[in-house]
Design a protein with these regions (language model features):
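Non-catalytic signal-transmission and effector/linker regions of two-component phosphorelay proteins
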Residues: 1-18, 125-142
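Two-component/phosphorelay signaling modules centered on CheY-like receiver
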Residues: 26-45
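The feature encodes the CheY-like receiver
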Residues: 29, 72, 90, 102
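Alpha4 helix (beta4-alpha4-beta5 surface) of REC/receiver domains from two-component response regulators
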Residues: 33, 78, 101-116, 129
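Acidic catalytic/metal-coordinating carboxylates
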Residues: 49-52, 75-78
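Active-site beta3 strand of CheY-like receiver
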Residues: 60-66, 71
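A Lys-centered signature of the CheY-like receiver
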Residues: 120
């Protein structure tokens, strides 16, 4: 049924959650990706700017986006707005990461649709734990 209707079944079949990591710092993207790969429960894609993040969300339909707020083109808040404006993406969780922590800015991100926020720098393990919490899944003890 799902294949006939163009609904991707690969993630369902693998039982893995789909994760999109968005940050313009490729080293950090690689670190985050490694952390989630070690957990073993994620199918991962990455993007380095807001435009690619928007395209990635539409095509990949991730369960979770780890989203840097300060991107070179479209900021994270705008990416949140775009994801939240598409009812087909209602189930996508967004975890914003940033070095800036002004309370009103974090509040603006939440209003734009972010589910959670973590301040940089953070331990990758803590990020994976937060992500698993957002997705209501247990961390694997790999």
């Amino acid at each position: 049924f799902m294949k006939d209707n163009g609904i991707p079944t690969d993630a369902l079949e693998s039982g893995k959650k789909k994760l999109l990591i968005v940050d313009d710092d490729q080293d950090l993207v690689d670190l985050i990706k490694d952390g989630f790969e070690r957990d073993g429960q994620f199918e991962i894609r990455t993007a380095n700017n807001g435009f690619d993040a928007g395209m990635g969300v539409k095509e990949f339909r991730p369960d979770l986006v780890v989203l840097d707020v300060m991107l070179p083109d479209i900021n994270g808040k705008e990416v949140c707005h775009r994801v939240r404006s598409d009812p087909a993406l209602d189930s996508v969780k967004i975890l914003c990461i940033s070095g800036m922590v002004e309370h009103n800015k974090v509040e603006e991100l939440r209003e734009a649709g972010a589910n959670d926020f973590m301040q940089k720098p953070f331990a990758i393990d803590d990020l994976v734990t937060r992500a698993c919490g957002l997705l209501e899944m247990e961390r694997s003890l790999a």
